């Protein structure tokens, strides 16, 4: 029985880099696959994309790059998309910059957020069917600050359904701690392996339903990871439990030893035995 590995952000980064550098999958392609997986999750939950009103909020890093792909693919599938950047275009680099360019070329309206431009975001969020959170990602350390914190407030206050890309913004992937403001998602789509922050509170509560997808990370890179934990899910638990016939009783399936209580504190032991 192979239990699902649970990793931290550094380990996931190493898997990503080995997939790119050793096994020849371009980072741009991984980003495309990640964005496509999110769009497929949206289509499955909303029974199609045409006419769906979606706000996509992106940061400057790779998490934002996934978000640019989401926005472009939604637009190409007849959704109504508003894309908001929590940074200046010039601050976006690498593969993310390439995808931002492609998204703008495809005709997606893109707005840079500043302290004086939140009115457009507020209006779009209130009117949309879904918000896609691609703001901070798994590299977050510490509390979201400045414009990111303001955006998170707007997302949460809107009351609209949220789908988080990889992890809700504000949740630390290595611990599940939320040191400041954090997005409260209905669904989180994550890639390759679950992270610690998906499974430990309060981060777990921010994730909503966790949707794990394979975007083609190299198998040797995944296999070589020494996880910080393994996930014992329902299927794994069921495989560990012996099959019992319908007429079993306490005398036919072994005995239970109770180790509990102390002198003068036997109440819990008595209740357990009963």
Regions found by a protein language model. Name each.
Residues 1-86, 93, 198-274:
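Small-residue (G/A/S/T)-rich helix-start motifs and N-terminal tracts that mark the onset
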Residues 40-135, 143-165:
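Nucleotide and nucleotide-moiety/phosphate-recognizing core
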Residues 110-117, 145, 169-173, 236-242:
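Short gly/ser/thr-rich secondary-structure transition/capping motifs
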Residues 122, 129-130, 135-227:
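Internal gly/pro-rich beta-alpha loop/helix module
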């Amino acid at each position: 029985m192979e239990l699902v590995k649970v990793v931290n952000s550094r380990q996931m980064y190493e898997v990503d880099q080995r997939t790119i550098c050793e096994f020849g999958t371009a980072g741009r392609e991984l980003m495309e696959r990640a964005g496509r997986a999110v769009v497929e999750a949206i289509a499955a939950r909303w029974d199609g994309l045409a006419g769906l009103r979606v706000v996509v909020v992106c940061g400057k890093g790779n998490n934002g790059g996934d978000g640019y792909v989401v926005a472009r693919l939604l637009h190409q599938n007849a959704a109504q998309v508003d894309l908001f950047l929590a940074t200046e275009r010039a601050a976006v680099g690498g593969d993310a910059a390439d995808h931002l360019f492609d998204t703008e070329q495809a005709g997606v309206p893109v707005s840079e957020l500043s302290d004086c431009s939140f009115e457009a975001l507020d209006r779009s969020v209130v009117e949309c069917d879904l918000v896609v959170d691609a703001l901070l990602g798994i590299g977050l350390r510490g509390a979201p600050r400045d414009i990111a914190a303001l955006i998170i407030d707007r997302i949460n206050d809107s009351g609209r359904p949220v789908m988080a890309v990889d992890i809700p913004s504000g949740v630390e992937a290595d611990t599940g701690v939320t040191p400041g403001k954090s997005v409260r998602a209905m669904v989180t789509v994550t890639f390759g392996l679950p992270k610690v922050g998906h499974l430990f509170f309060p981060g777990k509560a921010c994730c909503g339903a966790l949707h794990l997808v394979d975007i083609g990370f190299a198998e040797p890179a995944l296999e070589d990871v020494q996880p910080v934990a393994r996930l014992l899910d329902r299927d794994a638990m069921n495989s560990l439990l012996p099959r019992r016939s319908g007429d079993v009783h306490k005398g036919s399936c072994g005995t239970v030893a109770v180790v509990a209580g102390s002198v003068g504190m036997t109440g819990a032991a008595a209740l357990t035995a009963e």
